[in-house]
Amino acid sequence: MLEKLKNLNLVGSIVVLNDFFLDRIIKIQDLAGLYKQILEKTSLGGSIRGIPQFDIKGGNATNVAHALVKLGCPVSLITVADSTSSHILKETFSEFPKVSLFIIDGKPGRTTSLEFNNNGDIVNIMLSDLGDNENFGPDKLGSKEQVVLKKADAVIVTNWASNERATELSRFAFEKSKSALHFLDPADIQTRPGEFKEALSELGSDLDSLCINENECNILLGQYGLDTLADVDNTKKSVKELATRTSVSIDLHTSIGSCWSNGNDVEFVKSFPVQPKFVTGAGDVWDAANLVGYLANLEPAERLLFANGAASLYINSFQGIPPTIDQVLSLIKSAKTNTL
């Protein structure tokens, strides 16, 4: 694994599309207590104090791009922002010379992410204003963006579910990048499950990987009348069948582990044991490391292990900082040593 990652030499860049959000993370220690306080304030209003919160850059595409560049990859991020949020984007990536920003003028999204404990697991609920991410189509991509697509080593389109024109955008981006690997991460498709099933049939022949989490996978399994995820054996069976039905390789990440299948073969790799401190954006870090694994020609089990390691380091960070390749490899080496 080490040699393959060290020998990774990208001629072009990894192109990431297309969403940028300004995120506010609100950490809720006592959900029931907060709900009670809100009800008490509904008649006359007032303040509820002592709720920890902070602002970060967000959006699946922006998070994936940030994680990729931390892993040492050249990245071209195509997104939308206004003059104020453009400064935030530029500041975020200012220390990384391998990043090219293609910022289309428009309204960025805004998300308030509520993080709380649910039976020992940290979960998040995101309240979003989509901004101009909602209607980001091929017409947004000018000659400069099309040139970078043509030279790309890989292209990933994220947050399909929030973009009404995502299928159209994906088709255009993949057609303009014939020699690149193509990835799609749909995000939460709960409000558009049937439409996404149709999109997969349209885009499938150009897709190298569909990247989904447990919730998204269960929704998609339901569209094909397949069993939802349960234990490891069931997960492997369901993901393999889903890959067969869609004719697309599936890369799934869950809290217990990650799974890949191309419809013929299947692999499952358990997650690293970790106490989560930060969950918003963890799937984006997993996507980034998984993509790097593809480009480095890692075997499926190696690739899943590498992606799991990257995600575990991220969620174990209070600030949610994506790891470097060396940090991920060090974790994997340490874990293997401890199991001997």
Where are these regions (language model features)?
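Gly/Ala-rich phosphate-binding loop of Rossmann-like dinucleotide-binding domains
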Residues: 65, 69, 295
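Active-site cofactor/substrate anionic-group-binding motifs, chiefly glycine-
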Residues: 43, 49-53
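Ribokinase/PfkB-type carbohydrate-kinase core domain
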Residues: 1-38, 52-60, 74-76, 81-266, ...
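Conserved glycosyltransferase catalytic-site signature
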Residues: 61-62, 284
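Short, conserved phosphate/pyrophosphate- and ester-handling motifs at nucleotide-, phospho-/glycolipid
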Residues: 68, 213, 283
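Short, small-residue alpha-helix embedded
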Residues: 218-222, 276-300, 304-310
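Short arginine-rich
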Residues: 311-321
